[in-house]
Amino acid sequence: MSTHFFGLTDRSFAYSHSVGRNEFSGTGFRNPVDMAVGDNDVMYVVNRGYEYRTDGVHITVVTLSEEYITEFGSYGAGPGQFVWPTAIALDGQGNVYLADEWLNRISVFNGEGEFLRSWPDGFEGGATQDDSSRMIAFGAGADIPAGKSGSGDGELDRPAGIAISKDGTIFVTDSRNHRVQKFTLDGKFLGKFGTFGSGLGELNMPWGISLDKEGNVFVADWRNDRIQQFTADGEWMASFGQSGDGVGQFNRPNGVCVDDDGDIYVADWLNNRVQVLAPDGRFVTALKGDHVLSQWGKDKLNSNPDMIRQRALAVSHNPNYERSFNHPCAVKIDGQGRLAVLDHFGGRIQVYAKSKDPVLV
């Protein structure tokens, strides 16, 4: 548990449990990079896999109660496939939007994983490729040409984050164009904001993006090591953080979300922690991981005596071997107000319950 008293309010975060383990398919994740929360606490987890194991590239659908539901998607450039999946979001109907920074496109699926369309390349659901036309690569992008990139309105160059507002506006962090673009649900360009730089309102390879309940936009300004806040129209509002490993400082933040209290959660990638900020950007606390082996992990461990011995040896040398975050990459708030932290190299989700009570100071 991590607790930090701040003003007249305390916020405490009690570790609940973990979901997942390192696995290429089924009840686990392999180099996960983002997740989205659906109804009934269903989680859609984007697996990036390895360059030498492209079967790890897919979306896993689970619940935070450790129920495995299904997985969908595969490696490739065809309709419904992806090479470097990076970010995921759901619209109000439960459709899934996936950003691919290699193919420079957004692919859309229904909640069951059926491909519907993609843009800006214009693939529609039902399109197929015969076996002779399929491109197979064993290194990311080795045999698959990168999707067309551009800097014009509606064109993408390494889309890295995606969020969808209540009115159906899609916000995409267009990383190498150093901007945020806005689209309709079917991919029509609506507007953009942000330019390259380190000044207020400027961006340098923005990554994660999230909206608060008022519709304000929070961007993980990755290379500037800060979080920036904008209105939905792109007007700059605030900037939080700077480079470093101290309180309120960041080292390549790549995920951000905001809860109903307005508290801001930042996946501080290279500092291996999640920082919690008050609505005005002041530091509240930092979470560094409290992992206890998930049920899926226990099931695998109990069936493999050699793995039991190897794990015991690793833990004896470093008691924090398992518990700590290992490059946290995404943070989300579920329907119960719990914080879910996606651990990239840990291949798991760590879940925390928040308490916020008045205290006497």
Regions found by a protein language model. Give the residues of each.
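Eukaryotic scaffold repeat domains enriched in small/polar residues
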Residues: 1-361
